[in-house]
Amino acid sequence: MIYEATGRYHRDMEGVLDTAGHALVKVNPARARRFAQAAGYGAKTDRVDAAMRERMGAVLDLDARPVRSDCMHEIRELHVARIGLVKDRTACRNRLHGARNKIVLTQLRARLRQVETQIEQIDAELHRLIADDAGLAHRFGILVSIPGIGPVAAITMIVEMPELGSMDGKQAASLAGLAPITRESGKWKGKSRIGGGRRSLRRALYMPALVAIRHNAQLGQVYTTLCSAGKPAKLAITAVMRKLLLLANALIRDGRKWTETAP
C-alpha cells in the first residue's frame, strides 16, 4: 500500500494497516508530485492522486519499509524538539552579545538557562528510551564506539537512518546524499557532486568526520591522501563522512563494536 507522508496524521493509519499485515510504502510528497508531473498528471484530486501513486509504485518498484515503533516515534519527536531548542540557544547567545539593556539581558539569561535545562531534560529522556529498548541500546552502543561519533550524532543516525545495517554501502551513501553524482554527456564531463538524500544526516556527520580525521588512523589517512592529491579539503571531509557512514552500516550489520582493525 502506497501513501504520502503527512506528518502526525498518517501515524494512526500506519498502525492499523501494519497490524492488519499490509506492506506499507511511504513516499515523499515532493517526489510523488514530481512523478505526477513527469507522467502527465496535471490535475490534483484524491482520485487522480490514488491512480498516480499506484502507477508510481508499479513503475519504480518501491520497497516496503517497517513501520516505526511507538518508541521510535517518541525518540523522533524528542530529537526534533532538541534541534529547535539548540537553535533557540544559539539565538539567545547571539542576542546576548549585542544586548545592553538590563531588562533585556536578564530576560535573555533566564531564557538561556531555561533552554539549557530543557535540552538536558530531553537528553535524559532520549537516553532512557534507548536504554529501555534492547535493540536500540545495542545499535547506540555500536555507534558511540566509533571514534568521532558521540551520543548526539548516534541518536541522529538512529532517527534519520533506521535502515542502517540492513542495506549495502552504496544504498547507505545514496540515502544520505553522500554518493557522488556523475555528470557527463558524450565527450563532456562535468564535476561529480553530492546532493539529495537526507540533509539532516549529512549535517550530523560533519563534526564527527572532523573528529575522526584526528582520532581514527584509517579515516585520517583517507583525508590526508586526498588532500595530498590536490583535492579540496571540503571534498576530503565529505569522503570521510561517507566512509564513517559505511563503517557504521557495516558494524551494525555485523553486530559488533568498532576496533582499531575494523574495516
Q: Language-model segments: which ranges?
A:
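A detector of single, family-specific signature residues
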Residues: M1-P263
